[in-house]
Amino acid sequence: MAHAHADADRLARVTLSRTIEPGDLRVTGLVSELGADKILGYLEAAADVESHWGFALAQELGRVDPAEVLEQAAAQGIRFIVPGDTEWPTQLGALRNTGALHDRGGEPVGLWVRGVHDLRQFACNAVAVVGSRSATSYGTEQATELSRDLAAMGHTVVSGLAYGVDQAAHRGALVAGGPTIAVLPGGVDRPYPAAHAQLLEAIAERGLVVSEAPPGAGPTRTRFLARNRIVAGLAEGTVVVEGAVRSGAINTAHWTTNLHRPLMGVPGPVSSVASTGVNQLIRLGQASMVTNAQDVITDVMTHAARSVAGGAEQLDESFVPGPVRSTQRAVPSPAAGVSAPLR
């Protein structure tokens, strides 16, 4: 019976993934609370559901054959994972409690994945490196070197495959022979931008390509915004390398802050428009200044150690860096007269 329920839930999530925009909080929140099968049944039966979504949602739901969708995806080397799967990164569950930005939010109903590696294992030691699409030579160099060194030190680099800083981050990780995760705004079978098709294939072969949007889906503005929360949600912390005040990188930074995870920034020239956003984050104390991979690792480990020592929340140990896990049992409890470190 439990197996049948799990199958029904997975198929319902496939149907929702094919019909509902990624990060639609009206759905993601309810699915997390009540389950996908129950919410799908409501959407199929509700007479006034069209007035809330603005299109004939019930008809769209009825056109989806989820088993066929999974079969077609598998033929392309694409799998669909959902909360509760052993491969599901449990840290994404924190997105249930972070509200919304630009009407996007919540834990994904599922993720479409390309690549042979295990997403949960890759994400347990991940750092997001994001920044301007119109990166300067300075930004490209900093993103490449930072990501190369992070990967060489055993960290997975998460980014969005965009022009500029994103592609530099992926390339830096690949040069080091390390893991990288590309989170796309459209289907994992659709390289965006098209000029990065070869890079996408390299990541699919040596890393992982992930999307909340189903195979075949194209990128849209709302899907870019939804994608940013997945980038932040997968990572232990986020580094911004260049980014204007209003940019996708700063949106990802806001998600990181909402998740109470370390936000870091590589400072840029005061004369560079590309660095106005990240420089402002640093000036306002919203991001710590980092200049190399060791700075990043120190910030991430310090944050994790404080969270464990302070008991702020029950952390999934797979998400805490190994050096912190190995020492947390030696941390005296508050009953022993040792207070938590100051934030």
Name each model feature, range by range.
Residues 1-95, 284:
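Short, small/acidic-rich helices and loops at N termini and domain boundaries
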